[in-house]
Amino acid sequence: MSEVEFSHEYWMRHAMTLAKRAWDEREVPVGAVLVHNNRVIGEGWNRPIGRHDPTAHAEIMALRQGGLVMQNYRLIDATLYVTLEPCVMCAGAMIHSRIGRVVFGARDAKTGAAGSLMDVLHHPGMNHRVEITEGILADECAALLSDFFRMRRQEIKAQKKAQSSTD
């Protein structure tokens, strides 16, 4: 029986499921899954608020798991699927871990370090280059984030309204 090769879309849907776990924990809904030889070796979702850890981004969580599974910090030939373009911190971790590719959904104009704001992954001064595939399920990934922030703004507005009515 031959091994099934899963598509970028398949793995991005898995990352979106993880992003929804972040939403359920009231974290910014970003999910990441790390794949090596068609097998999940790490996964994560944003958890900086709950963990009181500014580095607990989805990508970092997945890379940490991958290192433990592979018993090596070098994750050569691994592919990281993430619902949002990585930030500078996460892009740096990808370079240090030596992953081969990052596949992301939505671009991040404010903090994206894989081409939107800057391109850390292809910077000529870096000792490793990470291939980039972007736009996989981009609209769905962006909609999840937009819906989350819309909900948060509505909650804040309702809290302010409730507070002003008690004053």
UniProtKB/Swiss-Prot annotation:
* UniProt GO MF annotations: tRNA-specific adenosine-34 deaminase activity; zinc ion binding
The gene name on file is: tadA
Reactions catalysed, as given in the entry = adenosine(34) in tRNA + H2O + H(+) = inosine(34) in tRNA + NH4(+)
This chain's protein is named tRNA-specific adenosine deaminase
Its lineage reads: Bacteria, Pseudomonadati, Pseudomonadota, Gammaproteobacteria, Enterobacterales
**Keyword terms:** Hydrolase, Metal-binding, tRNA processing, Zinc
* Quaternary organization: Homodimer.
Cofactor info, note text = Binds 1 zinc ion per subunit.
Species this chain originates from = Escherichia coli O6:H1 (strain CFT073 / ATCC 700928 / UPEC)
PROSITE patterns, alphabetically?
Answer: CYT_DCMP_DEAMINASES_1, CYT_DCMP_DEAMINASES_2
What Pfam families does the record point to? MafB19-deam
Required co-factor(s) are: Zn(2+)
Supply the Gene3D superfamilies for this chain. Cytidine Deaminase, domain 2
EC number(s) in its UniProt entry?
3.5.4.33
Please tell me whether the keyword Zinc-finger is annotated for this protein.
no
Q: What class of enzyme is it?
A: hydrolase
Metal-binding as a keyword of this entry, yes or no, is yes
Binding positions (Zn(2+)): 57, 87, 90
This chain's function reads: Catalyzes the deamination of adenosine to inosine at the wobble position 34 of tRNA(Arg2).
